[in-house]
């Protein structure tokens, strides 16, 4: 991906950083449904952190084509960066409506609810997504994070396990799993998650080790 997200909220940055290249990218610059000239314009506005300009550009294009999921994503991103989380959620809901089989839309919608401090709605959104089609490592990770927001460590651990089963090198999911086990006091399971992080040479291993629970 070409365009970074220096201004994202921590939650949104976390979502986009799930892309395998390990950066904090945005999908805006490579959307096939957006003309090259507009992709460049999007990149320029994002680089300037001109969220009002980006919102206006998205709305102008949506006035011509209300069925463009790409422009709904751009609009949602702009609203999110401007702190308008409810508007962002409304835009991402349109993405889900237009492309229900695309897990990206569901993930963005769930993440927008987390940004708005509504983790229960994020959980409901991701569970609905998993009824539509099989989840990805990323959607299961987000579900684990959403349950963790609610201090529901048992379902969080279950979701994180689904994530690492789909991607055994997903360090942040292993960290979430270990953290859930620590909160549950499950020392043996915690040690397995920690060992895996150490095998991955992840800096998260040190952070997780500090959460080691008492034996149980």
Residue map of PLM features:
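Structural marker of alpha-solenoid helical repeat scaffolds
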Residues: 64, 98, 132, 166, ...
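Position-specific recognition of the canonical hydrophobic site in helix A of tetratricopeptide repeat
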Residues: 46, 73, 80, 114, ...
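Canonical tetratricopeptide repeat
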Residues: 74, 108, 142, 176, ...
């Amino acid at each position: 991906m070409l365009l970074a997200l220096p201004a994202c909220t921590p939650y949104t940055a976390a979502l986009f950083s799930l892309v395998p290249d390990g950066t904090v990218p945005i999908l805006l610059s490579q959307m096939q449904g957006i003309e090259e000239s507009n992709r460049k314009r999007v990149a320029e506005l994002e680089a300037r952190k001109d969220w009002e300009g980006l919102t206006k550009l998205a709305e102008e294009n949506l006035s011509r084509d209300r069925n463009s999921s790409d422009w709904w994503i751009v609009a949602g991103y702009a609203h999110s960066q401007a702190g308008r989380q409810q508007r962002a959620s409304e835009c991402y809901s349109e993405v889900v409506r237009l492309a229900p089989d695309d897990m990206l839309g569901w993930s963005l919608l769930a993440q927008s609810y987390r940004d708005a401090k509504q983790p229960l709605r994020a959980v409901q959104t991701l569970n609905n997504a998993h009824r539509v089609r099989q989840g990805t490592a990323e959607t299961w990770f987000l579900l684990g994070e959403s349950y963790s927001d609610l201090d529901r460590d048992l379902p969080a651990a279950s979701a994180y396990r689904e994530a690492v089963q789909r991607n055994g090198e997903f360090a942040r999911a292993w960290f979430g799993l270990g953290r859930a086990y620590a909160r549950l006091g499950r020392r043996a399971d915690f040690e397995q998650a920690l060992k895996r992080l150490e095998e991955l040479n992840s800096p998260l291993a040190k952070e997780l080790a500090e959460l080691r629970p008492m034996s149980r």
